[in-house]
Structures are given as C-alpha cells and as structure tokens.
Amino acid sequence: MPGLDPGIHVLDECSKEDVDGRNKSGHDEEGRGLPMPIRHRALWALAVILSLALLIAPALWNGFALLHWDSGGYLARWYEGTLEASRAVVYGLILTVGVPLSFWPVLLLQAAATLWLVALTLRAHGLGKRPLLLLGIIAALSVTTTLPWLTAILLTDIFAGLGVLALYLLLLRADALSRVERLGLIVLIALSAATHNATLAVLLGLLAAAAVLCLIDRRRMPLVRLGRGLAALVLGAVLLLSADFIVAKRLAWTPGGFTFLFGRMLQDGIVKKYLDQHCPDPALQLCAYKDQLPDNIDTWFWGSDLFDKLGRFAGLGTEMEKIALDSVIEYPALQSRTALVATAEQLIAVHTGDGLLATLWHTYAIVEKFTPQLVPAMRAARQQQGEISFTAINEMHYPLALIAMALLPVIVDWPGAKQFPP
C-alpha cells in the first residue's frame, strides 16, 4: 500500500502544498527518495509481516475467519441478488471474492489497511522511519484493545474506525502526504462509507464540522482539503449504488437507515406512544398489534414471528420509516432525552467479543447453502466448538477502554494536539 514504506514517496512537483508542507515537516531532509539499506528494508519487511500476523492472530488461532450474526447477511448478497437492511453489498462482494481462499484475503485486506493507516499516522506526526515503533504499537493495540478481533472477523465494523482516521489524515495532515497517499485515503474513505450507513453518517458529520472550520479559518482548513473529503464520500455513494445495481439490477440505496431508527424508538417506548396516539388508523398495520410489540430491537428484527408475519423489512419498511420520521417531529424533547441516554449506554458498552458466538445459525446456513466447500473448516474452527471466551480478555480490555475515553479530554487539551497544519 502507498505510504507503508516511509522511505519511498512520490513528490508532486505541481502541488505547492506538497512542497511547502514537506519542507516544513522536515521529511525531505530525512532523505526522502533515497534507497534504503538492505538491512533496513529487511527490518521493515519483518515489522510488516509480524504486524499483519498480530492483526489476524485471532483468526489464525481459530483456524478460520471469525464470524458474526451479520456475516451471513453480507455473504448472501451476491448469491441471492437482493438488498437487505444494513447489509452492504460492497462488503458482500469483497467476501465473495475471498471465498476461494476461505476469506483469508479479506482478513489480510482489513489488516493491511489498518497497518497502513497506523504507519501513515506515525509518519504524519513525525514518527516515521521507525519499523520497530510501528511493530510495538501494533503489538500493544493487539494485546490491550479489541483491534485484532475486528480485523480478523467478517464484519464491517473495522471500517468505521479506519474511515474516521483516514478522513482525519486527509483533512488535517495532508501536508505530510504524497498525492498517491491522498488518493489511497480517498479510496479507503469511500470504501468505509459504502460499508455501512452509520459510518457514512459519522463521516458526513465530521466533514460538516470541517466545513464550519473552513468558513471560520481558511488557513486551518483549506477549501482543497474539504473538496478531497467531499470527493471521497461522493465516491463512496457511487460505490454503494454501483454495487447495489450490479447485484439487485436496480439503482437503489441499501435499506435499513430509518428501520433501525424505528428499532431504537421501539426499544425506548416511543413507537408505543405514537401508536397509542394515532391508532386506529387503517394506513398503519401495526395498530392491530401495538400491544404485542416487543421492547427489544434484536427481538423485533431477528426473533419476532410478528415481524416475519407482516413481511419483515419489505412489508413494513415504509411504515416503520413513516413512524420514525413522524415521531422525530412530534416528540423532539423525548427523542433528545432518549438519544442522550442511549448514547451514554453505548459509550460504556465497550466489551470485546459482542456477537462472537458459537450459535450463529443464520450465518452457518448461508455458508452451508452457498459455499459448502467451506463448511468443514468452518465447523472445525474453535469458535464453532465453543472454545472462545472473552471473560479474561475483558478484565483488561473493558477498564482500559473506559480509561482511554476518560483521558480523551486531556489528550484534546494537550498543547501538541492544538497544532493544526498550515
């Protein structure tokens, strides 16, 4: 990947930002463009190989890619030729490409993207050309955080973090990047945005904040950098629509945004309040069942006979969207209060291993139906044998995650963090 080897970079002679930024950061004075000694190249190669191994270590130990409840939904998209709520077709196509080699290319892609971003971040902050430092940081993150459990699983969650970090580098550290590296970040941001509507929403929010900064101080946030961020998200939308068209043969956005907003409102009691006030209404199917609705989002979407009876997402999608949008307008104070409570609960729900179970019947069924050649390896994996436990892991990960979040205001207030690039 571009930028992983800090000794070799492309200098864009046409970009004044490149030249000025690199001179100020001192990278050119470090011997940019000069060939590295063989010993140093060997050290980099060793650091990269060991780092990649650490990032997929859980899968190596497991004997197969780690699986989640959602993994089967992604994999099924190409084979079923349909769109499913919050199951990104882009990621499903990536999984399909990885099938012949038992998904190992997918895990390596996720690990390589992570390693590249960490290396790029170190160099952008003046800590490049240190292969052992890179290896040490990857090792520390692999032991003390959930990172390798995200890079070693067939799930889009890893791209949420990668997308945010990539956007940060593109917007605020562009002076330390070559044109090739910026293009690589744009592609990675686009891919991240296309893997989940929630990730796209977060990236849009961050870009909006950058736009405000651009209006206030063009020196800190030049318009050209804002344009790159916007281009990345537009490319993400194009990727999403193109993949959906290839698979479903129609131009459509991956469904699920409003339906899962409905699910949160259902869990918070807002849907019950809405139905109590608006029923009877012949336009609302749920009026006839308002006293039978569960108060848990997972039960409603994945374990409710009533939801199945009413046609699931296809049959109730429009109605759930209407209720969700109307409820936002009618109960703004209640929405704000419940959203704040849900946010607080999510911030402390940071245990490692959520959804990594041995009873993933839907994912197992999808693998058995569409990729039967992978079933023996999948069934023999430690996860499917019930050998994975996160009790001891979370005794370390959980408090460290809370401490890290508590220290965030301190880090933000750290003098070095306030130095924006010119």
Segments (PLM) and residue ranges:
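Membrane-interface anchor segments at the N-terminal boundary of transmembrane helices
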Residues: 43, 97-109, 338-421
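Extracytoplasmic catalytic/substrate-binding loops of multi-pass membrane glycan-assembly enzymes
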Residues: 61-75, 82-101, 316
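Loop-to-helix entry region of an early transmembrane alpha helix in multi-pass inner-membrane enzymes
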Residues: 89-93, 100-119, 134-136, 150
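Transmembrane-helix motifs of polytopic, lipid-linked glycan transferases
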Residues: 104-128, 139, 143, 162, ...
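Specific aromatic-rich, kink-prone transmembrane helix
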Residues: 120, 159-176, 184-189, 206-207
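Short acidic/glycine- and proline-prone juxtamembrane loop motifs at membrane-interface regions
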Residues: 149-159
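Membrane-interface alpha helices of multi-pass inner-membrane proteins
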Residues: 182-196, 232-236, 240
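Membrane-proximal stem/loop segments at transmembrane-domain junctions that anchor or position
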Residues: 253-371
